[in-house]
Amino acid sequence: MLAETLVAPGDKVLDAIGEYRMGKGLYEANRRIFASVAGFVNVYGFRDKSDNLVQVIEVRRSEDQLDNELLPFHGAIVTAKVMAVGLRFAKCDIISIGDKVYKKRFSALLPKKKLRPLEPELSEPFKNFVRPNDYILAKVCEDAEIKDKFVLSIAEDELGVVLCRGRFGEPMQKVDWNTVVSTRTGKTEPRKMAKVPQKCTLPTQSVA
């Protein structure tokens, strides 16, 4: 992968470390080198005590604040699309921070324990909170068990589903903070709806 390439956690940087020395922001798995943080690939060299040239490859945040604002970071509020739902996680794609829409979507996981505050062992199925193709407002957070992807949380009241559709592609309307209704069939479904701040930019019904 070329220097200055934008990478996310879990992205492959090199097939093998080869001539490089591994620097910060990287980890090795199955002899391949992957990014452990979001940032830009950087390569630099220095002379060791034997005057040999050592090349180091790393992933680091840009010194340009405008570049950093384009990357998901711990504590950032992002808009994401739910791609699939399992027993322990929902797989999501981060699509924007505020009004900045990414050309590249960043893969993320929404763990079951990040759905509601103070309820780490939820007995309810995932579908009571989010479903595939929902758009959610979420916070980027940390999880000691997940190191190769962004981790999302919708535990706070302001976070959750902001846009969803029914089985026929019709818009679903909010009944209350835990329920939506189909504009076509009148059938209700459970969701954890976000109590969205007024200044927050949200996806529209035209989003695919």
Swiss-Prot record:
InterPro entries: Csl4, Exosome_cplx_N_dom, NA-bd_OB-fold. Its main location: nucleus. Keywords: Exosome, Nucleus, rRNA processing. GO terms for cellular component: cytoplasm; nuclear exosome (RNase complex); nucleolus; nucleoplasm; nucleus. It comes from the Eukaryota. Ubiquitously expressed. It is found in: Nucleus; Nucleus, Nucleolus; Nucleus, Nucleoplasm. The keyword Cell division does not apply. The keyword Nucleus applies. GO terms for biological process: rRNA processing. Component of the RNA exosome complex. Non-catalytic component of the RNA exosome complex which has 3'->5' exoribonuclease activity and participates in a multitude of cellular RNA processing and degradation events. Involved in regulation of antisense ribosomal siRNA production. Involved in response to cold-warm shock. This is Exosome complex component CSL4 homolog. The lineage of its organism: Eukaryota, Metazoa, Ecdysozoa, Nematoda, Chromadorea.
